[in-house]
């Protein structure tokens, strides 16, 4: 199968959708399919050979975060040329509601089109303003995929169409078999936080609020922080407890997996804006017990607390108590890790890719090719 994929978010910075697109493409290529990915990217960014840059992206607020997107008439022309230059059997557009390449690709293409909806937000100003304009383009979509029940529910309620639920994929062996970081295991306990720690919705303030209780029960505890942000500012906010913070910065996938394997607990105190929770699955694959906010998306991944502990949102005391219960009770830890090791098989990329291929098969039965719209 010759597959064209469109990613709306820039490959300049890591992100869940970018990782999903790249890893899915790699799995398909390993299986003998031909894949070309179109995505925003700067000239100085090293890209996989199957990724075509649509040009540099612009940072704009989107879904409670800052997304790096690409749009405009020049971009539209590049999309049409990319479609015309390739003889795709299917075009797979990720996040078709994002005001970037994906919206433009939906306008520019005709033929077998599959769309994956990653988010479940209804707060987008673009969608609120242009939903009527976008609806005819959404009707071009032959196959719809939602990565979670929340994203699927949004499809039904907001767009009046249904989607098959296929979760995000994870390279389970890469996390299960990762080596620990140099210097680990350390004498004390390690709690991992992963994400843009100065982005409020990631919940670092909640973890800082739990830190005094964690230090009291485990004086040698370390908060290992992986991700971008203002380190000096966070140290000031931590005050006298700043010595318990260790920063790795932005890392590659292999180092992220090693960090997860090195931690005693993975902590996800997010406040909202999550439709899935791929990092929870990665931690589960690494054999690291999870403590997470009881967001709907996290609750589903952790199977209502069977595969990880859930705590009320913005509750530092509950977060500290849950982390401590894992650190102090091997039976709790083993129960969570064992349940998680069974659950993660659902998210292994070979399983997920096969489900997506079946969607491709349903939209390509007529033998029609993807072409630039007239």
Residue ranges and their predicted role:
Residues 121, 127-146, 157-158:
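Membrane-proximal helix-turn-helix segments that form the acceptor-binding/catalytic region
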Residues 150, 169:
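Carbohydrate-associated surface elements
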Residues 183-202, 208-212, 224:
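Conserved donor-binding/catalytic core segment of Leloir-type glycosyltransferases
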Residues 235-255:
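Nucleotide-activated donor-binding/catalytic signature segment of Leloir-type glycosyltransferases, i.e.
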Residues 250-251, 258-263, 278:
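Short alpha-helical donor nucleotide-sugar binding micro-motif in glycosyltransferases
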Residues 265, 289-292:
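Short hydrophobic beta-strand element within catalytic cores of glycosyltransferases
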Residues 304-305, 309-316, 325-331:
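Conserved acidic donor-binding segment of nucleotide-sugar-dependent glycosyltransferases
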Residues 318, 332-346, 358:
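A short, well-ordered alpha-helix in the C-terminal region of glycosyltransferases
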